[in-house]
From Swiss-Prot:
Oxidoreductase listed as a keyword: yes
Gene (UniProt): MO1
EC nos: 1.14.13.-
Upregulating conditions: Induced by A.brassicicola, especially in cv. Di-G during compatible interaction.
Source taxonomy: Eukaryota, Viridiplantae, Streptophyta, Embryophyta, Tracheophyta
Needed cofactors: FAD
Expression across tissues: Expressed in seedlings, roots, leaves, flowers and siliques.
Signal peptide, first to last residue: none
Family membership: Belongs to the 3-hydroxybenzoate 6-hydroxylase family.
Listed name of the protein: Monooxygenase 1
Keyword entries, A-Z: FAD, Flavoprotein, Monooxygenase, Oxidoreductase
Amino acid sequence: MEEIGIVIVGGGIAGLATSIALHRKGIKSVVLERAEKVRSEGAGIGTLSNGWRALDQLGVGDRLRLNSSLIHKARTMLIENGKKREFVSNIVDEARCIKRNDLVEALSDALPKGTIRFGSHIVSIEQDKTTLFPVVHLANGNSIKAKVLIGCDGANSIVSDYLQLNPKKAFACRAVRGFTKYPNGHGFPQEVLRIKQGNVLIGRLPLTDNQVFWFLVHMQDNNHNGKDQESIANLCRKWADDLSEDWKEMVKICNVESLTLTHLRYRAPSEIMLGKFRRGTVTVAGDAMHVMGPFLAQGGSAALEDAVVLARCLARKVGPDHGDLLKDCSMKNIEEAIDEYVDERRMRLLGLSVQTYLTGRSLQTSSKVLRLMFIALLLLLFGRDQIRHTRYDCGRL
């Protein structure tokens, strides 16, 4: 049986970022990715200042800035019964939209060759009865014993199942994300614009002068699976039918291949607060740990923060002399490092989880009473500074 110091399950944003963070601390890791190549599905990721701090610690921030534009303002419009209410806030700190594909490529390019093992489909995880370290079983019949196993395998995480975390919950809505190109320029201001009209929430973020990332959420329509790209595009056109002409045009001329349809899910705040995110030397990061709705645009940035904090905590305990973690590093030291990581992340993630949940529910409900209640709770818990979460600093790697 092959033995590896640190095994990371999942080659998405969280997994690649965690591997880079460990690499920059002199600690080797192997990333097991189910797909046959780097996963590039998905449209854009709104990345706020806390995410850019983490990207700079990972050494890829400057590369990603080259293909993204600064966002200067956030604007939300609520249209009800023909009446329009508008809320505007200036963005002082760094905020940009980046292509998910650009981010994944930047992360994968920063890793040593051979770090990512493609086509590695994990079917089960068990604990070795003698050493108590985790053993990963692959679909090809091979097994790997790891000193540390980090699950970065998304919302349907097999590692979170091993940790016996409670199942994720679902918002009663689906979201579509996509890109639209404007060959002659879009002419939109450099702002995040969200419009809530009826059961539809739509928003857009300029990526460059000629390209826009947009999202479309239907708060009640939960019955469409989107069998192919064209059916997703038709669904978007249907949802956007009551919107103004510029929004309908944006959806109509979009890059159909860029569209992704997702059922919005979240890990309950109570699970974030009380969940056991370590079992032996196994833990999770990214969506496997804290999948959340897109309402604060913090899912991707929170995963980047996880990577920095986890690598820092492990490096503090094992040191660069144990780069492959197969030498003298004890299970106790590893467990203590993971506990430090979980403790440091828990309250940060709890705040994001609660704020995201309340924001999503306030947008989703059709009851004015419930909406006012959710807004009152947001003000009570987070004050008038509702973007304070963007100023969080995960610290130096």
